[in-house]
Amino acid sequence: LIAAIIDLIKEFKSKHEIAGIGISVAALILKDQGTIAGAPNIANLSQLNFVSEISKVFNLPVIAENDANAAMWAEFKFGNAHGLNPVIFFIIGTGMGGGLVIDGKLFRGASGIGAEFGHMIVERDGVLCGCGSHGCIEQYASGSALMRYAKEEMKADPIKAKELLKYSDASGDISGATLTTAAKQGNEIALSAFNKQADWLGNACASYTLLLDPQAIVIGGGVVDAGELFLTPVRSAMEKYMPFAGTHTSPKIIAAKFGNEAGLIGAADLVRG
């Protein structure tokens, strides 16, 4: 993997002037901004150090940052989180990553793995997570959870399953995009799956609000394509589960500005210092 990254950098360097190298990766990154402590959703990354290996080849500043932290930074500096303090970011994909900015700085914690919101345990002895624990919110509010909810309902009701499959691709498989399209057309299974996912995420937002009192919670990743169809039930669920409801101002829940390139934008800005 590192060799492939080095080859890619060489290709860019042959065509462009490069001032630094910022890498966004879906993994826990230690505070040295180089060593990978763990990667629940990507095999064989643990203990790799991108920075030390790449620095041997290029005489340039190099940093590696958790993808959600990098995306959080992009939204804070240039996107829909600009000027907000504190602000939380969730990236909802295969897993569920998190980032946090307090007083204009990324919060990394003592060793660098802080704000890993996707691994808050919400269900004791719940679904096994890639991190090795059980019942992490990632297993209930991620894109993978969305797919699981849909498939469970398809299995329980074959007639409704056929209706959903009308929105599938040529292979007959369903995807997050399939569910988004179907939900926008009012498909029962797709809407139910999104509502279950939103309920869990709203529950988590309520807990994080009491912990950090953010001005806003920004949501990125593929679920943003569903728009208010997803965000509205997240807000409703947050209010439903909010402790001390009515005694404080709830955070805004808003969609991220940037899509899949958010991590790249954030990493590029972070390496500039």
Residue ranges, per PLM feature:
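ATP-binding/phosphotransfer module of carbohydrate and carboxylate kinases, centering on a glycine-rich
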Residues: 1-20, 29-35, 51-60, 77-84, ...
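General beta-strand structural signal in soluble alpha/beta enzymes
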Residues: 62-66
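Active-site glycine-centered loops adjacent to acidic/histidine catalytic or metal-binding residues
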Residues: 67, 93, 267
